[in-house]
Amino acid sequence: MTNLNIWYGSNENAEFSNLAKRRFFHDGYTYETVEHAYQTLKSGEFDARTYYRPWAPGRKFIGKRADRNTNIALMEKLITKSFMQNTHALNMLTDIHPSIKITHNQDRGIWRTEFPRILEELRASS
């Protein structure tokens, strides 16, 4: 089985990364990247300090502590919205053959498995 690893920092399929520019709208706010939205919202409350940082593709600012009861579902929602509102990116994702496994090898936390799972589920359902 062939793998498609996603990691912005090494430019491995960076267009699918949570740090890639895919501007989207969620709950009254516009976000530059999925990471922008996630860091702003992961605590369960809107974090204005994080939202108004100088976000750009590849940039990451750490927001408040994540609510571990909701953070994975939040990431699922944000990734889905970002692709649905950026159809070119969605088409690129769905063009990846189903036999190709999406990976996120450099990550050492929950996103090593959760991030590829979310993308693979979105790819399969779109």
Language model feature labels by segment:
Residues M1-S126:
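Charged, low-complexity intrinsically disordered segments
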